[in-house]
């Protein structure tokens, strides 16, 4: 992905948002508890920050991303997690982390055409609607906690 492309800007926004305090923890809790796709959660949040509703595209985004996620991203993540704390594999585990992130970049590039949507005002309600569109199984409590962390993060992240 070229850095000057819309995909590159979206990826940069995702990594910046993920680095904000509380965002990673909220996303990983949703991933561990509900099987949420962190990449989709972050992309949905960034689109909401730009005032773009993806509510109508939620099922298509999930369906389009699932084959790559299940065949590439999840196996890399699973192996990396299983190797946590094992002696002598730290460097190899870091390589897996790099591959996992690159696989998520490729997933984002594949999903980018589906992330376009009608413009609206960037509001908390739009953020929650976008998150619900890509992860409808999240409990209301998990959705609220995630939305709060993401909204706090998007205000602090560059471009917020």
Predicted features and spans:
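Short acidic alpha-helix initiation/capping motifs at coil-to-helix transition points
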Residues: 5, 21, 36-40, 71-75
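Structured binding/interaction patches within domain cores
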Residues: 49-111
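Amphipathic alpha-helical segments within well-ordered protein domains
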Residues: 27-28, 44, 77-81, 112-116
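Short amphipathic alpha-helical segments and their helix-coil junctions
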Residues: 10-32
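N-terminal interaction modules that seed assembly of large macromolecular complexes
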Residues: 25-63
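Charged, compositionally biased N-terminal leader segments and the immediate start
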Residues: 1-16, 146-159
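A charged, amphipathic interaction segment
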Residues: 83-153, 157-160
């Amino acid at each position: 992905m070229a850095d000057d492309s819309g995909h590159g800007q979206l990826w940069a926004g995702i990594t910046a948002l993920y680095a904000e305090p509380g965002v990673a923890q909220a996303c990983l809790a949703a991933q561990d508890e509900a099987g949420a796709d962190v990449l989709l959660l972050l992309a949905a949040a960034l689109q909401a920050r730009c005032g773009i509703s993806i509510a109508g595209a939620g099922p298509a985004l999930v369906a389009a991303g699932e084959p790559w996620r299940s065949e590439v991203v999840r196996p890399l993540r699973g192996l990396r997690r299983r190797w946590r704390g094992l002696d002598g594999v730290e460097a190899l585990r870091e390589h897996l982390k790099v591959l996992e992130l690159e696989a998520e970049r490729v997933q984002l590039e594949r999903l980018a055409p589906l992330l376009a949507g009608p413009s609206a005002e960037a509001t908390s309600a739009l953020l929650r609607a976008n998150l619900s569109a890509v992860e409808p199984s999240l409990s209301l409590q998990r959705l609220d906690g995630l939305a709060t962390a993401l909204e706090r993060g998007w205000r602090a992240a560059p471009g917020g």
